[in-house]
C-alpha cells in the first residue's frame, strides 16, 4: 500500500485527488495540508511514502517546503503537481530534489503512474519534461542562462517579466521587499540584463511567457 499525502491550498483540488486516488486499491491518502508548513509536518510525522504537492501556496511555498523536506527527509518522494507549464520549473525542481513534476492538466492516470513510479525510489519524468531535457542535451552542454537560475530566482524572474512590482511580489511570496530586490539583482546579473523590460523581452523570446 502506497501512503500518499496531498498538499494544495485549494480544497476542491485536494477533494478531487482524494476521490480519484480512492479508486486505486494500492494507494491510500493518509494526510493532507494546504501550505508548505503543513507539508513539512506531514513529512515529519512519517505517515506518507509519497508527498503530492503544489508549488504555489500561501504561507511557506512548495518551493521552500521542498528544500526543507529534502534537507531533513531526503528519502521521502516529493511529487510536484503544478499548474505552471513544465518549461517554467520542471528542470529546476528536479535538480532541487523533486521525484517528479506533472502538470495539473495531465491525464488523471498519469498521476497514479507517477505515484507508483516515485514510490519505488525512481524519478518520474513525464513526456513533456523528457522532451525538454532531450532538447537541452541535443543543444549541447551550453544551457540558456535562465536554466541556471535557482527555483526562487526563476519565480522572481517570471513575475517581473509579467510586470509585477517588487512590492506585490514580496506580499504574494511572503518575503521582504529587500529580499525580492536582492533576487531581482541576482537575476539581472545572471541573465546579463539591465532592466525589467529586458526581462520581459527575454522571457517572451524564450517562450516562457506569452
Regions inferred by a protein language model and the residue ranges of each:
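Acidic catalytic/metal-coordinating carboxylates
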Residues: 35-38, 61-64, 85
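Short, flexible helix-to-coil linker/hinge segments that flank and couple to helix-turn-helix
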Residues: 88-95, 100-155, 208-209
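Active-site residues of response regulator receiver
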Residues: 54, 82
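Recognition helix of helix-turn-helix DNA-binding domains
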Residues: 165-198
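Helix-turn-helix DNA-binding segment
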Residues: 142-178
Amino acid at each position: 500500500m502506497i501512503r500518499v499525502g496531498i498538499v494544495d491550498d485549494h480544497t476542491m483540488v485536494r477533494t478531487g485527488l482524494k476521490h480519484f486516488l480512492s479508486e486505486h486499491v494500492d494507494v491510500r491518502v493518509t494526510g493532507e495540508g494546504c501550505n508548505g508548513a503543513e507539508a513539512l509536518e506531514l513529512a515529519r510525522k512519517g505517515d506518507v511514502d509519497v508527498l503530492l504537492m503544489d508549488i504555489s501556496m500561501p504561507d511557506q511555498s512548495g518551493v521552500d517546503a521542498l528544500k526543507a523536506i529534502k534537507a531533513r527527509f531526503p528519502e521521502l518522494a516529493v511529487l510536484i503537481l503544478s499548474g505552471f507549464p513544465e518549461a517554467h520549473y520542471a528542470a529546476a525542481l528536479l535538480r532541487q530534489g523533486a521525484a517528479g513534476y506533472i502538470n495539473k492538466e495531465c491525464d488523471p492516470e498519469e498521476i497514479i503512474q507517477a505515484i507508483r513510479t516515485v514510490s519505488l525510489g525512481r524519478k518520474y519524468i513525464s513526456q513533456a519534461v523528457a522532451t525538454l531535457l532531450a532538447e537541452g542535451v541535443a543543444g549541447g552542454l551550453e544551457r540558456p542562462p535562465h536554466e541556471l537560475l535557482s527555483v526562487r530566482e526563476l519565480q522572481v524572474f517570471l513575475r517581473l517579466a509579467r510586470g509585477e512590482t517588487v512590492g506585490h511580489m514580496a506580499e504574494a511570496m511572503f518575503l521582504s521587499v529587500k529580499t525580492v530586490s536582492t533576487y531581482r539583482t541576482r537575476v539581472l546579473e545572471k541573465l546579463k540584463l539591465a532592466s525589467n523590460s529586458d526581462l520581459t523581452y527575454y522571457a517572451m523570446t524564450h517562450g516562457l511567457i506569452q
